[in-house]
Amino acid sequence: MTFDHPSNLPKIPLAGSCSGVYFLYNGDELVYIGQGWNCVLRVAEHTRKDSDKVFTHWSFFPVENESERKDLELQLRAQHKPKFNRV
């Protein structure tokens, strides 16, 4: 993998709102789907020492509306059945 400059990489804000549905991956495997009004803070919670979730990277899909976020999260969980999501 190569890149010409770090400024060309995707950016995720550390402050402010990045509401949406987020996806945790362990390598190529999708292991968890969640949602929140601030995905950065939610993903940070999954890095706690007592968390059983092991993941190598994450991504998110922006969704501002709370009910739309929750609906999309439920649909995606049912479709993909990530191993760390409870049924």
Description of each model-found segment:
Residues 82-87:
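Coupling/hinge elements of helicase-like and P-loop NTPase modules
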Residues 1-41, 45, 63-77:
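GIY-YIG nuclease catalytic motif and its immediate N-terminal context
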Residues 52-55:
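Charge-biased low-complexity segments
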Residues 58:
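Acidic, glycine-enriched active-site microenvironments
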